[in-house]
C-alpha cells in the first residue's frame, strides 16, 4: 500500500452547522490523517488539524452510503465522501492503517520484542508448509490418470496450473524474505531501537539510516528490528512485513486541483519530501483541530468510567482472552440473589409472573467497559459491512433471556392488542392496530445497557400468557387446544419456536380466544458490523387477524441498531415499515428515524394512516417510540396517540422451571442464565458452549442419517412460517 493517500472530503463543523470542503492526506506509516483548507495550504504545510489513527474505530451509517466517522481520543469526527465508491476507498485505506498501528501497539504493550531469530523461525515454518504443498501437488497427477470425463479433466488441469503458479509465487516470496533477513543481519543498527516514525504535518519521512534493499521488488524498505514484525499470529497475511515505500526522488506526483468546483476522487500517491514543508514535531498525543469547532459526539463517553482513548488492554489481547490465566479475570463478585428469585415463575398466586421482567441491568453497565479489550479483539477480526451471523460473541454481553422470549414483549400491552377487535368501524380498527404496533417496542428494553439475547437453539420453544386487566376469576374455561392449554379463554397466549438455524428464523403466534383475534409472524435476523454499531435487519412479516371481520393486517418490522458498542451500548430502531389490510384498503406507513450523525433526537417515529384510495393521510403521528407519540387528524383534532411512560406493562406469566419441557427456553438456558446472574462468566461460557456443541452434534447425526429436521409447532407456507393450529383453523373445524 502506498505511504500516502490524499484527496478531497467534506468534514462537519459546528461553527458552520454543516459540511466544509477540506483536503485530506492519509499517512499510512505515521498513522495520521491530516487535513487542510486546500491543496495549496497542504503544499505550504499549513495543517488545519489531524486525526490520530492508532486505536481509532471507523463507523458507517447503514442508511447513508457517503458518510463515515472516525472515533478516537474521546471524539467522533464526521466525514462525507462524494459517493459510495469514494467512501469505500477511504475506508479501506483507513482500516489498513488503523489495523497496522493497533497491532503494533498490541505487540509493544504485551512486552513482545520481535527479533531476527523470530523472523527466521517463521521462515522455516513457511518453508515446511511449502514442502507439504508441493507433496500435495503430486496428487493432481493421480487424479488426472483416473479421470475419464473430459470436462472434469479440464477442471483438474486448470486447478493444477493455478496451484503450480501459487507455489512458484510462494517460493519467490520465501527467497525474497530470506534476502531481506540476510541484509538485515548485515546492516542492522547497533542498538536495534531506532524508530522509523518521523511524523510531520502530512507525510512519513524515512529515517536516513534506514537501509534500502535494491534487490527486492518495488525497492522495499526494511524497517528497524523492534517494529519490523508483529506477532505472526496477530498479523493478517494482507499486511506487509514492513512499510513498503518507493524510492523518493526529486519529482512530484500530480495531485487533484483543489480549485475545482466539485469533488474529485482521492488520489493514492507517493509524495517526495519536498512536496510539503517538513516539521520536526512528533505525532500529536491527541487528535486536534485549529479550533475546537468540529462536530464530535463527546457525550458518547460521558457514562464510561474510564477513558476510551486506549482501546487495547495494556496486558495485550492474549492474556485477556485466556480466562483462566488470572484465575478469575472475567468473573464478577458473587451475589446473594438466588436462582429462584430470577427464574421461578409459578402458576398460581402472587408468584405467577415473570420476575425476569423486574430485573435492573443498569448495575451491569461496567461489564462491557471492563471487557472492552475482548470486544476490540473480536471486532478486529471483522470488516465493515460484514455479516455477523456466524461470529461468536463474548458471553458477558448476553442478556439473560432468549430471543424468543424477547419477541413476547410485543404483547406487553395485551389490552391494546385485543381492543383491535372491539372497534366497530374498519377505520378505527386500523388506527387501533397502529396504536398497538407503536406501543409494542418499548417494553423490550428496560435497562439502560443494551445487551444481546441468546441465539435460540433449533427447535427451542417459549410459551407464556397474559391475564387482561379486567379479567375476573370467574373466566376459568381453558383453551385446551390452544398454544398454552392451561390458561383461560380470556387470556392472551403466546408461543414461539426457532424453526431454522441457518438462516436464523424465529416464528411466533399469539391469540385471544374470546376476542377472536390472532397474530402470526416470522423474523429472520441478519446482523451486520457497522464500525461503532451493529445493525440487525429484521426480515419477515406479521399478520394481525380479526376473525369476526375476516380482516388481516400485514405488517413489517423495523431494523435494530446497537450503538456505542465500545462504551455503554444503547439500542435504536430504524427503517420504514408498512401495515396494510387488503380487505378494507386501509394502510399505514411508519418510519423509525435513526439519530443522524450531526445532531437530532433519538428514537423518533413518524407515521401516516391512509383511507382506501386516498393519497393524503387522515391521521399523522409523530414522537418517540419509547416515549410519547402525538396524533394529528385531518379534522384538526390533536391528541396523545400513545404514551409509553404511562401505559402499564402487564407482566407475562411463565410456567415454573421444573414444570417446563427440556426444549423450552428457560429450561434450555437455565445454567447460562444462573451463571450470568451470579456473574460467573467462565461458567456461563462453558454452559453456552455445551448447548452449542449439542446442537452441532445433533445436526451432524441428522446429516449422516439423511434425516430432515421437523419443526414442532410451525410449518413453512411459501415464504412464511405459520402456526399449525391457529384459532382461525380451530374455529372453522368446530363449525363443521
From Swiss-Prot:
This is Oxysterol-binding protein-related protein 9. Interacts with OSBPL11 to function as lipid transfer proteins. Together they form a heterodimer that localizes at the ER-trans-Golgi membrane contact sites, and exchanges phosphatidylserine (1,2-diacyl-sn-glycero-3-phospho-L-serine, PS) for phosphatidylinositol-4-phosphate (1,2-diacyl-sn-glycero-3-phospho-(1D-myo-inositol 4-phosphate), PI(4)P) between the two organelles, a step that is critical for sphingomyelin synthesis in the Golgi complex. PANTHER family: OXYSTEROL-BINDING PROTEIN-RELATED, OXYSTEROL-BINDING PROTEIN-RELATED PROTEIN 9. Residues 253-275 have a biased composition (Low complexity). The gene is OSBPL9. It catalyses: a 1,2-diacyl-sn-glycero-3-phospho-(1D-myo-inositol 4-phosphate)(out) + a 1,2-diacyl-sn-glycero-3-phospho-L-serine(in) = a 1,2-diacyl-sn-glycero-3-phospho-(1D-myo-inositol 4-phosphate)(in) + a 1,2-diacyl-sn-glycero-3-phospho-L-serine(out). The keyword Acetylation applies. Residues 2-99 form the PH domain. Belongs to the OSBP family. It is found in: Late endosome membrane; Golgi apparatus, trans-Golgi network membrane. Pfam families: Oxysterol_BP, PH. One of its GO terms (molecular function) is sterol binding.
Amino acid at each position: 500500500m502506498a505511504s500516502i493517500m490524499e484527496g478531497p472530503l467534506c468534514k462537519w463543523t459546528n461553527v458552520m452547522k454543516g459540511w466544509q470542503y477540506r483536503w485530506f492526506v492519509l499517512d499510512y506509516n505515521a498513522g495520521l490523517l491530516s487535513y487542510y483548507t486546500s491543496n495549496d495550504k497542504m503544499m505550504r504545510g499549513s495543517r488545519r488539524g489531524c486525526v490520530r489513527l492508532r486505536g481509532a474505530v471507523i463507523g458507517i451509517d447503514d442508511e447513508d452510503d457517503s458518510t463515515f466517522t472516525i472515533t478516537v481520543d474521546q471524539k467522533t469526527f464526521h466525514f462525507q465522501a462524494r459517493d459510495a465508491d469514494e467512501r469505500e476507498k477511504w475506508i479501506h485505506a483507513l482500516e489498513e492503517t488503523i489495523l497496522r498501528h493497533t497491532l503494533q501497539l498490541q505487540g509493544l504493550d504485551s512486552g513482545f520484542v520481535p527479533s531476527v531469530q523470530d523472523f527466521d523461525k517463521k521462515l522455516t515454518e513457511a518453508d515446511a508448509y511449502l514442502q507439504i504443498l508441493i507433496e500435495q501437488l503430486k496428487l493432481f497427477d493421480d487424479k488426472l490418470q483416473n479421470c475419464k470425463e473430459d470436462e472434469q479433466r479440464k477442471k483438474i488441469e486448470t486447478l493444477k496450473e493455478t496451484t503450480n503458479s501459487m507455489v512458484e509465487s510462494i517460493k519467490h516470496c520465501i527467497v525474497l524474505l530470506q534476502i531481506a533477513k540476510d541484509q538485515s543481519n548485515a546492516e542492522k543498527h547497533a542498538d536495534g531501537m531506532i524508530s522509523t516514525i518521523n511524523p510531520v504535518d502530512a507525510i512519513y519521512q524515512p529515517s536516513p539510516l534506514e537501509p534500502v534493499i535494491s534487490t527486492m521488488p518495488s525497492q522495499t524498505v526494511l524497517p528497524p528490528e523492534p517494529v519490523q514484525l508483529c506477532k505472526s499470529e496477530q498479523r493478517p497475511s494482507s499486511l506487509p512485513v514492513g512499510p513498503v515505500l518507493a524510492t523518493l526522488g526529486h519529482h512530484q506526483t500530480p495531485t487533484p486541483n483543489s480549485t475545482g468546483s466539485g469533488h474529485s476522487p482521492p488520489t493514492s500517491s507517493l509524495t517526495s519530501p519536498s512536496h510539503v514543508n517538513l516539521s520536526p514535531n512528533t505525532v500529536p498525543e491527541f487528535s486536534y483541530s485549529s479550533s475546537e469547532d468540529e462536530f464530535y459526539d463527546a457525550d458518547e463517553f460521558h457514562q464510561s468510567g474510564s477513558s476510551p482513548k486506549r482501546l487495547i488492554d495494556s496486558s495485550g489481547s492474549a492474556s485477556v482472552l485466556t480466562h483462566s490465566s488470572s484465575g478469575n479475570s472475567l468473573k464478577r463478585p458473587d451475589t446473594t440473589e438466588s436462582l429462584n428469585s430470577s427464574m421461578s415463575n409459578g402458576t398460581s398466586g402472587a408468584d405467577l409472573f415473570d420476575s425476569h421482567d423486574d430485573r435492573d441491568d443498569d448495575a451491569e453497565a461496567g461489564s462491557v467497559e471492563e471487557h472492552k479489550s475482548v470486544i476490540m479483539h473480536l471486532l478486529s477480526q471483522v470488516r465493515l459491512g460484514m455479516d455477523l451471523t456466524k461470529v461468536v460473541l463474548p458471553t458477558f454481553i448476553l442478556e439473560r433471556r432468549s430471543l424468543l422470549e424477547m419477541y413476547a414483549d410485543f404483547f406487553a400491552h395485551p389490552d391494546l392488542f385485543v381492543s383491535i377487535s372491539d372497534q366497530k368501524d374498519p377505520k378505527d380498527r386500523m388506527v387501533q392496530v397502529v396504536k398497538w404496533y407503536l406501543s409494542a417496542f418499548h417494553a423490550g428494553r428496560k435497562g439502560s445497557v443494551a445487551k444481546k439475547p441468546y441465539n435460540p437453539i433449533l427447535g427451542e420453544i417459549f410459551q407464556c400468557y397474559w391475564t387482561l386487566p379486567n379479567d375476573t376469576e370467574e373466566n376459568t374455561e381453558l383453551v385446551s387446544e390452544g398454544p398454552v392449554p392451561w390458561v383461560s379463554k380470556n387470556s392472551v397466549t403466546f408461543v414461539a419456536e426457532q424453526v431454522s438455524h441457518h438462516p436464523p428464523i424465529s416464528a411466533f403466534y399469539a391469540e385471544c380466544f374470546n376476542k377472536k383475534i390472532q397474530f402470526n409472524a416470522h423474523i429472520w435476523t441478519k446482523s451486520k458490523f457497522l464500525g461503532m454499531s451493529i445493525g440487525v435487519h429484521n426480515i419477515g412479516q406479521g399478520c394481525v387477524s380479526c376473525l369476526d371481520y375476516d380482516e388481516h393486517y400485514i405488517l413489517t418490522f423495523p431494523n435494530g441498531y446497537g450503538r456505542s458498542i465500545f462504551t455503554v451500548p444503547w439500542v435504536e430502531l430504524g427503517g420504514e415499515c408498512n401495515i396494510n389490510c387488503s380487505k378494507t384498503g386501509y394502510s399505514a406507513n411508519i418510519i423509525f428515524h435513526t439519530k443522524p450523525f450531526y445532531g437530532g433526537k433519538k428514537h423518533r417515529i413518524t407515521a401516516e394512516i391512509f383511507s382506501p384510495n386516498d393519497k393524503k393521510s387522515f391521521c399523522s403521528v409523530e414522537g418517540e417510540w419509547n416515549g410519547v407519540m402525538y396524533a394529528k387528524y385531518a379534522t384538526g383534532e390533536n391528541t396523545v396517540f400513545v404514551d409509553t411512560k404511562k401505559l402499564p406493562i402487564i407482566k407475562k406469566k411463565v410456567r415454573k422451571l421444573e414444570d417446563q419441557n427440556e426444549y423450552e427456553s428457560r429450561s434450555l438456558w437455565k445454567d447460562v442464565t444462573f451463571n450470568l446472574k451470579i456473574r460467573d462468566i467462565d461458567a456461563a461460557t462453558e454452559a453456552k458452549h455445551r448447548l452449542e456443541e449439542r446442537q452441532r452434534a445433533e445436526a451432524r447425526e441428522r446429516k449422516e442419517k439423511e434425516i430432515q429436521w421437523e419443526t414442532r409447532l410451525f410449518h413453512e407456507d411459501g415464504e412464511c412460517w405459520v402456526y399449525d393450529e391457529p384459532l382461525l383453523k380451530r374455529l372453522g373445524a368446530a363449525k363443521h
